[in-house]
């Protein structure tokens, strides 16, 4: 049985960030590093949460929620004007990033949607965010458009 939840231990964070590293490296989005972790400056901030989908003790999917704060959000590097417009309207927002899934999982789409739903509900009802952004690599845009509309 797969369970989706907020990562609550350092071990879960490490497993999640290792999965992000593995998936990003396999798809050519990230080069090798000796720690085999994909850690961004945002992961070091208290305004960031990591979510995991686990089967037994194995992390099979992960997503990171970055709330707008000290460093802004990751998408701001590409979409400065759009993010600045939202901020000027006093919108409270965040970004889902590092959304990955281990390949070959049964019910991949359902797992993906369950994890995404959890992160969005947490953002809305626990963190009281008005909006949540999800920036996608160009080769994944058609998937997100098909699945999320």
Where in this protein do the model-derived segments appear?
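Pocket-edge structural micro-motifs
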Residues: 6-8, 67, 98
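Short amphipathic alpha-helix that is part of the acyltransferase structural core
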Residues: 1-42, 50-52, 59-60
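Short acidic (Asp/Glu) patches
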Residues: 33-40, 44-47, 73-85
């Amino acid at each position: 049985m797969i369970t989706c939840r907020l990562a609550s231990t350092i071990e879960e964070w490490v497993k999640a960030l290792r999965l992000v590293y593995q998936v990003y490296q396999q798809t050519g989005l990230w080069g090798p590093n000796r720690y085999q972790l994909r850690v961004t400056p945002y992961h070091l901030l208290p305004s960031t949460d990591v979510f995991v989908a686990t089967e037994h003790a194995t992390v099979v999917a992960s997503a990171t929620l970055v709330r707008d704060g000290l460093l802004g959000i990751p998408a701001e590097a590409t979409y400065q004007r759009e993010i600045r417009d939202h901020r000027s309207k006093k919108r409270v927002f965040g970004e889902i990033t590092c959304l990955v899934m281990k390949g070959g999982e049964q019910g991949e789409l359902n797992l993906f949607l369950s994890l995404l739903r959890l992160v969005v509900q947490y953002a809305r009802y626990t963190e009281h965010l008005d909006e949540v952004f999800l920036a996608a690599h160009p080769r994944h845009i058609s998937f997100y458009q098909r699945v999320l509309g």
